[in-house]
């Protein structure tokens, strides 16, 4: 690919110049003319490249999150005790019940890892529905513009799909039992403010938030790091080199 194409794509992706506010996809495509005997980069190529970028991102993100300890040993997305129950955990540790708190925390993350296995089809559906308008918005956007597109189009479906998985895993791993015991023990302490946060809703949303964080990381890699562009169309659209 000639260096002119690379430069133009780089400018689109970086979106660092004020003039990009006047970005016109048609004009960009007109400037993609290649030497005789070669083809132009079409709107379809750009959309295809973006869809592949998102697919790579969600595949890597989902795989990372759904493996054993994908949540539990990743401090970026590890699910901890709900904020409303932090005092519960702290108090129980002081009472020598830290192991129960640890078991509960592990169960939360196991539930997230199980739920993450269900995410890819939902993300793929959103990606295949992407329009040229969506693609232009993503190209002009920030480093996490594609991730924000997925947040807008998948959050509710993910929640509806994840909730029963989280519910089932929490029950299977006795997290609900641990949690109930923790809260009950705490609430029986004289003069403390009683707590009982919605554990299942909390764990479900934190699972979704964790996935988006991982996908945002993958998106940034693809935008910034040529090595992360694993297919020819990604190399073309995201301008890996002057080839």
PLM-predicted stretches and their roles:
Residues 20-22:
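Boundary of Sec targeting at the N-terminus
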Residues 165-206, 211:
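An amphipathic alpha-helical core segment
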């Amino acid at each position: 690919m000639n260096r002119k194409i690379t430069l133009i794509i780089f400018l689109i992706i970086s979106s660092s110049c004020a003039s990009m506010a006047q970005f016109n996809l048609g004009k960009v495509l007109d400037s993609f003319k290649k030497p005789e005997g070669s083809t132009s980069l079409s709107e379809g190529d750009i959309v295809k490249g973006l869809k592949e970028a998102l697919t790579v991102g969600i595949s890597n993100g989902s795989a990372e999150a759904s493996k054993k300890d994908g949540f539990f040993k990743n401090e970026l997305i590890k699910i901890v005790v709900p904020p409303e129950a932090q005092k519960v955990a702290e108090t129980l540790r002081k009472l020598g019940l830290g192991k129960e708190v640890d078991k509960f925390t592990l169960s939360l993350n196991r539930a997230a890892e199980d739920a993450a296995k269900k995410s890819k089809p939902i993300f793929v559906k959103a990606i295949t529905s992407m329009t040229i308008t969506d693609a232009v918005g993503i190209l002009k956007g920030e480093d996490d513009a594609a991730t924000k597109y997925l947040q807008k189009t998948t959050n509710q479906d993910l929640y509806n799909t994840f909730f029963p998985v989280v519910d089932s895993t929490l029950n299977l791993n006795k997290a609900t039992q641990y949690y109930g015991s923790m809260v009950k023990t705490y609430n029986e302490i004289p003069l403390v403010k009683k707590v009982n946060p919605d554990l299942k809703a909390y764990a479900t949303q934190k699972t979704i938030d964790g996935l988006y964080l991982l996908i945002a990381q993958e998106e940034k890699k693809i935008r910034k790091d040529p090595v992360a562009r694993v297919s020819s169309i990604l190399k073309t659209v995201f301008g890996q080199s002057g080839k």
